[in-house]
């Protein structure tokens, strides 16, 4: 088993802290305690908290992009959708929500480069969902009520807000409703 470097440990803990508390909900002191280093040494790797969050968004987005790319588009569209939805369902009941969803609620506090990265994350997901819906269209007996790209925005927005509401209400009902909407759309 590979031992993580201090930088990797800082980044991993940051991913968890942001998903639990948001950008303003943790400090370098919190990270220092978790990793067992001095606060000043964190600045060696990430001079500012903005640098740290930018790297966290980059890492989280890269992981999710790889997960999306790994979905085999030769599978039935319902299976593709189920694979895509699995992380959203898994997040329900945990104390962590989507990192980019959490940070999107704090965009007014974040630097412009992070704002752009968050937009890119949303667009990546919406584009993949739109492609899925386009692949499902020929199998449907009726057309979608809105273009696939618009429906993709609705579904992704519903999944993101569903994760936030799941934490608030302690139930996955809203994530399941969004997931059911996508599954019904691709099932025809």
Named regions from a protein language model:
Residues 9, 13-51, 55:
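Helix-turn-helix
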Residues 16, 20, 48, 70, ...:
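Conserved amphipathic alpha-helical interaction elements at protein-protein interfaces in regulatory
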Residues 93-114:
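Amphipathic alpha-helical segments used for helix-helix packing
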Residues 132, 181-188:
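C-terminal alpha-helix
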Residues 55, 69-97, 148-155:
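Hydrophobic alpha-helical connector segments
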Residues 49, 56, 60, 64, ...:
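Hydrophobic/aromatic residues within well-ordered alpha-helical segments
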Residues 79, 100, 113-124, 137-184:
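Hydrophobic/aromatic-rich alpha-helical bundle segments in the mid-to-C-terminal region
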Residues 3-14, 31, 56-60, 64, ...:
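Generic hydrophobic, amphipathic alpha-helix propensity
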């Amino acid at each position: 088993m590979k031992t993580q470097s201090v930088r990797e440990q800082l980044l991993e803990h940051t991913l968890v802290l942001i998903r639990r508390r948001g950008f303003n909900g943790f400090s370098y002191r919190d990270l220092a305690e978790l990793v067992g280093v001095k606060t000043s040494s964190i600045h060696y790797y990430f001079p500012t908290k903005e640098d740290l969050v930018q790297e966290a968004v980059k890492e989280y987005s890269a992981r999710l992009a790889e997960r999306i790319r790994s979905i085999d588009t030769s599978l039935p569209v319902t299976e593709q959708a189920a694979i895509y939805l699995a992380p959203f369902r898994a997040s329900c009941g945990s104390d962590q929500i989507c990192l980019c969803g959490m940070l999107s609620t704090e965009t007014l506090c974040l630097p412009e480069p992070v704002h752009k990265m968050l937009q890119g994350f949303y667009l990546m997901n919406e584009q993949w969902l739109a492609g899925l819906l386009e692949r499902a269209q020929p199998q449907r007996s009726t057309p979608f009520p809105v273009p696939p790209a618009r429906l993709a925005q609705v579904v992704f927005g519903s999944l993101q807000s569903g994760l936030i509401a799941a934490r608030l209400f302690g139930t996955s009902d809203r994530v399941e409703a969004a997931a059911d909407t996508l599954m019904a759309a691709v099932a025809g």
